[in-house]
A protein has these predicted regions:
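A domain-level signal for the structural core that forms small-molecule/cofactor-binding pockets
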Residues: 2-68
Length: 68
């Protein structure tokens, strides 16, 4: 069944990750896939390892932080 991979900046926090997992699972279940068959993998990537427009996000987007 479906495996969903989510890439996000590190630091989003466990509660937000849990909420995201529940929300994604519900969205997939709403189209008829059994919730127990949905797998979700969340990768938290440091902004220093995330490129935007040829620069590390840590430099280009230094004023932006993950939601608290």
């Amino acid at each position: 069944m479906p495996i969903v991979h989510v890439d996000c900046w590190e630091g989003i926090g466990e509660e937000k990750v849990k909420k995201m997992i529940r929300g994604i699972t519900k969205a997939i279940a709403d189209v008829g896939i059994p919730a127990h068959a949905v797998e979700i993998v969340v990768y938290e990537v440091p902004k220093t390892h995330w490129g935007v427009g040829g620069e590390p996000a840590s430099e280009k987007l230094k004023d932006i932080s993950p939601p608290k």
